[in-house]
Amino acid sequence: MGASDFDAQPDATMGVLPVVDARGAYVVPGLIDIHSDYVENVASPRPSVVMDLSTSLYKADRELVSHGVTTIFHSLSVYGAHVFDHKPIRDFGNVSALIDRVAALRAGEERDHLIRHRLHMRVELDSVDLYDDIESFLRSGKVDLVSFMDHTPGQGQYRDLLVFGDTLKGYRDVSDEDVRDIVRQQQESQKLTYAQITALAAVARERGVSIASHDDDSEDKLAFMDGLEATISEFPISLDIARAARARGMHTIAGAPNVMLGHSHSGNLSAREAVQAGAIDVLCSDYYPAALLDAVFTLRDQCGLDIAKAFALVTINPAKAAGIADEVGSIAVGKRADVLLVREISCGEGESSGEHPGARPDGRAARTMPVVTRAFVGGRSVFRSHYPDQPLGYGRDPEQLVSLDQLTRPLAKAV
């Protein structure tokens, strides 16, 4: 949306954003991350350690806004079995406690924390014994997005059993025979039935909870999830499946780290290729919040994607996917004023999201990266950072510019 879309005379009585010097910056909507388990890493910095959960959410709140995230969907997983490793933070007791604490943060939105907190409940199909708990949470109003996952080896993300085995060995000291036993156990384990999944999806729809599929690898799975009125396909396995999901009107999600790495960490769909093909329309941070903003500029500089289209992948498109586009996702009259100032700064030499030949005195390419220098949530300033090479006065409020002007005048000699 351009400046011409707004009245040129702002109404100061409406309590809108203060006038801020944004020279040289991109003025963009706050980023919306609908799949992130980052809070697990904050709460559990070591596999056997679980820190205070409320404090961890507030710590994550501060870190996420520094990366431009103004709406976060904490992705908390409900598992029946822990195949790769056992993380106490993913025990159902801790997951339940986190769900309650996220709901409490939402109740205090724009008052006692910095960004908007939402809940994405990830349901693994082996969570048979937790069915009643899952249904209860869906009815509670604490869940904003639910996804159904199946990490059984031989399909989905691990349709290649060699990839599953290599991944498992990266977590645990197991032999090839152990891997075969685990594959057999997982394939034979009890799963939620189609009837149970259908019933949970009906509760979700009744409560206005968005529904997502996960690791889609076939037209049949897409058809089933489409029948449940799922609006999102997370991490489709191939370009053909991503295109098929889009053809059904589903939003398709890939990980921003995939964009940064240039490939999937598990050997599946390349996010860069899929975005360029129009088969992916949403990026999420997955496990690395810093990648969201970096991915936008990587797509611009290394893939030739228009910067506005790149930003849409992390703003308005995820807002539409999660059903919150009437509130956030774009800078528009009537929406919440979640706004960022983003600037590219020099950070040495070499590969980067942006290469600018001749920017250095020696004529070599300067490495740049995007940074958030100011963030507003609901029209309130919640974050500010300053780098030495920013223009004097950049990002400051008008009343501060007077004193800056005085500071730049030559000092009079004492007589």
Report residues per predicted region.
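His/Asp/Glu-enriched, well-ordered alpha-helical/loop segment
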Residues: R248-N258, G262-V342
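A general structural motif
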Residues: K191-T193, S213-D215, S233-A242, L261-N268
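Hydrophobic faces of well-ordered beta-strands that scaffold small-molecule active sites
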Residues: G30-I34, I72-H74, I115-M121, D144-D150, ...
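Metal-associated gating/positioning segment near the N- to mid-region
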Residues: A22-S96
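Active-site microenvironment of metallo-dependent hydrolases
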Residues: R62-S66, T70-T71, G141, F297-D301, ...
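Histidine-rich, glycine-flanked metal-binding segment
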Residues: M1-V28, P388
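Metal-coordinating catalytic core of metallo-dependent amide/deamination hydrolases
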Residues: Y79-D216
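Glycine-enriched alpha-helix->loop->beta-strand junction motifs that scaffold or abut catalytic
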Residues: S140-D144, M225-I232, A247-I253, G278-D281
